[in-house]
């Protein structure tokens, strides 16, 4: 992958976490939940360390979150390549496109703060 991620660190062994912020249709919360549950097995099968998905509970009713960690940028790139060819992943992406319960998706890549 090229672009902003490739310039974060010269060290390819820095752990990264992908934070995904979803703006969802609040009237299709159950459909988004089914979509999120499918990722619980797809993401680990493709090499991501899924921290979890979070649905709105109190307050804002149209924002959901996901966190996926990787030991390095190279591991993230390997994960993306696997995900592109995964039939279950393709089916889940197609479901989201057909049902249109995701209105917007934002990705932020984070690195941990360490003592050293």
Please report, for each region that a protein language model flagged, where it lies by residue.
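Short, low-order "capping/linker" segments at domain edges
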Residues: 106-116
């Amino acid at each position: 992958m090229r672009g902003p991620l490739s310039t974060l660190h010269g060290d390819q062994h820095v752990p990264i976490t992908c934070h995904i912020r979803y703006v969802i249709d609040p009237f299709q919360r159950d459909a988004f939940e089914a979509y999120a549950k499918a990722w619980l097995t797809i993401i680990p099968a493709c090499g991501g360390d899924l921290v979890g998905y979070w649905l709105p509970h109190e307050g804002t009713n149209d924002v959901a979150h996901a966190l996926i960690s990787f030991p390095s940028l190279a591991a993230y790139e390997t994960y993306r390549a696997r995900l592109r060819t995964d039939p279950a992943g393709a089916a889940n992406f197609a479901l989201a496109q057909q049902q249109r319960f995701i209105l917007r998706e934002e990705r932020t890549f984070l690195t941990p703060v360490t003592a050293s």
